[in-house]
Each structure stands twice: as C-alpha cells, then as structure tokens.
Amino acid sequence: MTSTLLAEQSDSPVTPQRVLEEVFGYQTFRDGQQEVIESAVEGKDSLVIMPTGGGKSLCYQIPALVRSGITLVISPLISLMKDQVDQLKANGVAAECVNSTMSREELLSVYNRMHSGQLKLVYVSPERVLMRDFIERLENLPLAMIAVDEAHCISQWGHDFRPEYAALGQLKQHFSHVPFMALTATADDATRRDILERLRLHEPHVHLGSFDRPNIRYNLVEKHKPISQIIRYLDTQKGNCGIIYCGSRKKVEMVTEKLCNNHIRAAGYHAGMHADERAYVQEAFQRDDIQIVVATVAFGMGINKPNVRFVVHFDIPRNIESYYQETGRAGRDGLPAEAMMLYDPADISWLRRMLDEKDDGPQKQVESHKLNAMSAFAEAQTCRRQVLLNYFGEYREKPCGNCDICLDPPKHFDATEEARKALSCVYRVNQSFGMTYVVEVLRGMQNIRVREHGHDKISTYGIGRDHSHDYWVSIFRQLIHKGLLFQNITRNSTLQLTEEARPLLRGDVSLELAVPRLDTTARAAKSDKLTSKNYDKKLFAKLRKLRKSIADEDGLPPYVVFSDATLIDMAEILPTSYGEMLAVSGVGQRKLEKYADPFLDLIQEHITHHG
C-alpha cells in the first residue's frame, strides 16, 4: 500500500503535502483543495463543488492515504471507476473497484483484500453499496471515509436525478460515525441544499469553488449547414482529440457517416450500440487510437481523458448543467480548449414540444426552468462566461475576453429606462409571475389571465408596447445575467427583484445593456495555440510518441502514463536526472521509478542532437 511505502521511506508522518508530492507528483494544492482535504483528514463531513478538471478526485484520494482504514468511493459508471483505479494503480496506490462485470472469483478476491487491509480505496456503484450483504461486509471493516462522486444525481433539482443516489441517505444513517464527502461539478443553489438534506451530512464543511474554466473558449455559431460547418471546424483541429455531441442516435450515425465519407476518422457512440462496440470505441478514444467521437450524452461521464481539445454540440443540450458538464470534458489538463455549439432556435422549440408531452408535475417544472436558462445562455448578448457562472450563483465582474461575445461584442445602449420599466412591472405583479407573463403585461396584451389578475389596471400595463416580445425577453434575460433579477426555480420560475435592483429603481444609478440582436449571427472565434509556454515542440511530439508506445505495451491510456501538461513541462524544463524529473509537475515517486528512464534517455538524445 502507498501509505505503507511512504511510512517506510522516512520517519516523518504521512501528511497531505507528502502524499501530494510523493504519490501524485504535484508541489502545490489547487484552490480550495487543501482546506477540503484537511477537513476530511479531521473526520468532518464535506460538500465539495469544484469544476471539472479542478482536482476533485484528490480531495478524497489524499485523505484516503492519510487516514487509516478503507475509503469507499460511490461512482455511477463502471468506466469511470475503472479509469480512476487505473490512474491510482499507476501512482502505486492500492485501489480496486466492485462492479457487475466482475466474476464471482474476482469479487471474492477484492473482498478478501478489503478484509485483510490490503486496499486503501474501493470504488462501487450506488446500487451495490445499498445491498444488504455489502452493507454487512462494510460493518466489519475499518472505514476511513465514504465519498459520493457525481453527487448532483442525489437531487430532484439536479439535471441527472437518479433514485438509487437519493437513497444514499440510508447509508449515512447506517454509518453515522464515518465521515462523508459529496462531490460534484454541477450544482446550483437548490441542488446544493437538496444534497445536504438528502445525504444527511452533519455540520459539513462546504466548499463552493469557482465554476470558471478559464482555459475553455465558449463559442456559439448559427446553425445553417451543420455538416459543412463541422468539417471546416475540424480542419482547424487537425491532430487534436475531440467529442461531437448530438441530440439523437440517428444524428450520431448520420454525422459519423458524413465525416468518414469526408476522410475524417471518427467513431460513433450511443446507447443503442452493442456493449462490446461501445467499449471498443471508448477504449480506442482513451488510448488515442481514435481522435474524434460522435456521441449522444451516453458518452462522457466515464471519460477522464485530460487532452480533449474541443467539444462540439451539434444540438443544444436540455440544460446548462449538461452543457457545463459536457464542455467540461475539454481541457482537463488546464491547456487551452474550445467549446463550440451550433445553435438554431428551432432546436429549442423542438425540446419545448417534447417537454410539453410529459405529464405535469414538479420534475416537468424543473426541466422547463432549466431549458429556459439554456435558451437564455444561447441567446445571450453579454459575456457567455458571465451568464454561465451567474446560473450557478457566481458573479464575475469583468467580461472574460475568451468567448464569441467578448471577441465580437454586440453594441450597447443606455437601457436605464427599459430596465426600470421591466423591474417595476415585476414589482407591480407582486414578484409572483414568470417572464412570459410579465412581458405580456408590459406589452399591454389583452388576454383572460391578465384580466383575471387585474393586471390590466396596474401602472406598468402596456408601458412596453413599443417593443416586441423577443426584445423584452432579451432585456429580462440580461437583467437576470446582471444579477438584478432572480428566477426562482422552486416557485415556478417566478421573477424576483434582488437587492442590486433597488438603486436602479430609485433612480440612483444608470444601466447599459446590449442592443438585443433579434437574429442570431455567426460569430467565429479565433483559434489559440495549445499553450503560451515556451517549450520545444519537436521534443513534445517525440515524447508523445514514446508515451503512446509505453502505454500500448502496458495496456493503458497514454494519459495514465503522463498527461500532455506533464510532457509539455518536460519539453520546457528538459530534465536529465531523477532529481530534475521529480520537479516536473505530475511526476511522483512511483512514476519516476516506472517510467523515467526512457523519457530521460530521449530528452538527453534530443539535447545532444539539437543543442
């Protein structure tokens, strides 16, 4: 076990910093990691909201190696478990998973190792962890901690609610003495509160990290000839790994066929394919044998591939959480990446029709609210990153400079009068109605609902009739993005004033908004180089080739050996000794022993021939 090895190497105690450096090969913690880890080491419950690629896994993996006993990790997908276990083993950590694909003999072997104290982390599905026989096994084990990954699946307000996750509160009740850590990258305020309540966390340490992924460029383009648009885009991404998401299996097959017909090597992936076919595509993508996967949302949650350089949405997702999660599969190594969406308002209309066919109920209301927010993001006239972060309750003061809106900004105007009309109307209808209704009142629409509520008699009725419905919708969405209005998901998406709205209503301040662009125009973002670091590009290419060869021999994805970010560090630092190699980010003691020699030889040879 890694903790044993660490103890053997010196008399000093096993600390989070030692584990970070010697096992995982990093010198410093990322934002928020240290506080979360220290809280877990002390035995406290935690809720961790951290962006994809922000280092969530280390938040429970490091405490697992510091605390005595076994850490149980509850994860929704077998592929995700396997990927995490492969990476831990590559770092010398004793880890295994328990899943439905394993034979009885394999399961018994893992159980024996659990009971003999040979394992530090065990990954398991929520379905299995709640089985009576498994709980009985756990009762006889020294549990260090229980981590619940993808914790948004617990909440009815989340975008991916799963009943088996919601039942995990029973586990906390059963093991009340064991510290729990719930982790997710996608949870708005309502979802966060629901996770805390359903999981029954006791006085938890709550870490709400920034949702910002600054290395990802967000770009929306008007969809007109989607296949041609994608082919032109892929032409700018030669040699890079990427995922193209489609809204249906039929589209996956169509797009894959068109790309292959245009001599672009791509593979399709959807739930209708045979399990062996899906496994082959996923494995080939992980190992860099396939560069592009065209997929439904069935693909991705189990992907921890750090060097995905782009994610394309052929169709708009149903909610911002899905968009954030799917685009978050790009650039997990921290290097520049791009998220491009082909947007057609008709796609939103189609999703609304699909939603209308569902039975009325709380879940339908939640889905409707989330679809409205996704539509607002797509039609945003302000910095897309600001809109995205605002949805998760995070406010960014300055535009990002790294989205299509910032790179090709819309025109702005003094919208003080329009904003005051809009906010006043929300106030006059007692902050009890949704956006469509308030716009109807503003525009003086004659309908039964407005008359029944007596809102055809209020002072703001009809004061906005000089502008179209779409114009006012754009104004309201911008006011939400600016934090002057709040759309309450738990009260039928009603509009409510925030404290920030008061100075504007009193006439103390003015406000600029974007002139509503009522027809979407294509805005292409300029492409970035991989990184601004000053590294040797030829050496980097050689290092990647060597990594692929070693990974294929070991039957591993290349990034499990070393990530692209680590190879770039090597190509910049040019290490020629073990000591210098340990200074490279991502090189720990186990990887140094296992992989350093061929990389050091290659670097020395390159220096000799190229100076």
Region spans (language model):
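Accessory DNA-binding and partner-docking regions appended to nucleic-acid-acting proteins
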Residues: 1-19, 366-368, 397-611
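Helicase motor core with emphasis on the C-terminal RecA-like subdomain
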Residues: 9-23, 27-31, 35-57, 65-67, ...
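Short, charged low-complexity linear segments at domain edges
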Residues: 363-392
